[in-house]
Amino acid sequence: MITSSLTSSLQALKLSSPFAHGSTPLSSLSKPNSFPNHRMPALVPVIRAMKTMQGRVVCATSDKTVAVEVVRLAPHPKYKRRVRMKKKYQAHDPDNQFKVGDVVRLEKSRPISKTKSFVALPVIARAARKAEAGGDELLGLPLESQQPA
């Protein structure tokens, strides 16, 4: 009688050792949730780390492919001075619109081939961007030289 009550209490506790049975039961491996499952808010900002880069086209002889050289500043491993590091990327140019010397924006995409996983997009020039944004007039006021006398 004492043995049966002891056995039933041990079964209720479900004491098991991985050494005794060869493996741990899957029910004990599942992590308990200490917090309730909350849904994420709808307006979560998308993190886009190193998915876009800017570079200059150095080779455009292949069909629908351009080689783009991206220059970045990185600390030298020994001297800790920031040096220019160059790297060439193969990018997809579906319309063959870019020529050597064009400045393009590389955007990460699905792998297109073994070496191509970026798409080349045109970059709006800085002067055109300022003119488009109305950079000549500060706060909507004309410059002093543009005012009538």
From Swiss-Prot:
Domain of life: Eukaryota
Transit peptide segment: 1-49
Keyword list, A-Z: Chloroplast, Plastid, Ribonucleoprotein, Ribosomal protein, RNA-binding, rRNA-binding, Transit peptide
Compartmental location: Plastid, Chloroplast
Disruption phenotype: Reduced plant size and pale green leaves.
Matching InterPro entries: NA-bd_OB-fold, Ribosomal_uS17, Ribosomal_uS17_bact/chlr, Ribosomal_uS17_CS
Molecular function GO labels: mRNA binding; rRNA binding; structural constituent of ribosome
GO biological process, one term: plastid translation
SUPFAM superfamilies (UniProt xref): Nucleic acid-binding proteins
Disulfide-bonded cysteines: none
CC per GO annotation: chloroplast; chloroplast envelope; chloroplast stroma; chloroplast thylakoid; mitochondrion; plastid small ribosomal subunit
Recorded family membership: Belongs to the universal ribosomal protein uS17 family.
NCBIfam families tied to this protein: PRK05610.1
Function noted in UniProt: One of the primary rRNA binding proteins, it binds specifically to the 5'-end of 16S ribosomal RNA. Required for optimal plastid performance in terms of photosynthesis and growth. Required for the translation of plastid mRNAs. Plays a critical role in biosynthesis of thylakoid membrane proteins encoded by chloroplast genes.
Subunit-structure text: Part of the 30S ribosomal subunit.
UniProt xrefs under PANTHER family: 40S RIBOSOMAL PROTEIN S11 FAMILY MEMBER, SMALL RIBOSOMAL SUBUNIT PROTEIN US17C
Protein name: Small ribosomal subunit protein uS17c
Species of origin: Arabidopsis thaliana (Mouse-ear cress)
The organism's taxonomic lineage, starting at the top: Eukaryota, Viridiplantae, Streptophyta, Embryophyta, Tracheophyta
